[in-house]
Amino acid sequence: MIKVAKDKGGWMHPSFYELADYLGPYFDLSWCASDEQKAVEDRARFGGTDEEWTRRTLIFAYQNIALATQGIHRPYLARLLNVTEDKYGFRILDYGAGGGQTGIALHFMGYRVSFADIYGSSLIWLSYRLRALKLDLPIYAIDEPTLEIPHQNVAICFDVIEHLTPEVQRETLIRLGGLADLVFVNLVRDADETHKGVHQVLDFQELTDFVSSKWGCSAEDFYPDKEGKPRQRLLIYGNVSA
């Protein structure tokens, strides 16, 4: 393994060591999005469209790990475990998987996991990770709308919807509802201007009403800002009760 930079505390999350092996001499921990403003600065330096940034830049791999290891999704995964605690081997689709941090963790917890994302740098990085871990898990490139993905018990989709245009947001929510019996998806709304130009502005209630008009749906808010407004909302919906 190459010698890699450490963070200020002298410790680096193990997933970054995987990325260091993957990138070799191109590894640079300074690319890690240590705070929200850094993500915006990285995005601005790259230029191009959001889709091009997601598909092409190596920065995305650092930011994906940084965000996935901060524990933001813990309450969502706790609810997933509570729903599926007596159903070992449940089939779970990690949709918009990025580097697959959540899906890989769920695999080691006993779930039968598959991954789906657009074809780009993060999907290639995920393929490398699975090979390095000797995991034979399915990966689907969702660029083709007619792609047949086997029906799942649960689909999870975290930190994805805010990157999509309003039309594609609804298309994705519908597609997820057709892929699994139960869907867990979070909605992210930035409380300030930090992510302006990176995230779409989401209307939580409008999207909740949209999903509720088609499926049974529960909604729970998380991470209130200084004014008490939630920065995230978890939707659980589908054809079975959560």
Where does each model-flagged region fall?
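Class I S-adenosylmethionine-dependent transferase superfamily signal
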Residues: 176
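Conserved N-terminal segment of class I S-adenosyl-L-methionine
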Residues: 1-150, 170-173, 198-242
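Conserved beta-strand signature within the Rossmann-like core of class I S-adenosyl-L-methionine
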Residues: 180-190
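Conserved acidic residues
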Residues: 90, 153, 181
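A conserved beta-strand element that flanks and buttresses the S-adenosyl-L-methionine
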Residues: 156
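Hydrophobic adenine-recognition pocket in adenosine-nucleotide-binding enzymes
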Residues: 160-163
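A short acidic, helix-capping loop that chelates divalent metal ions and anchors anionic groups
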Residues: 191-196
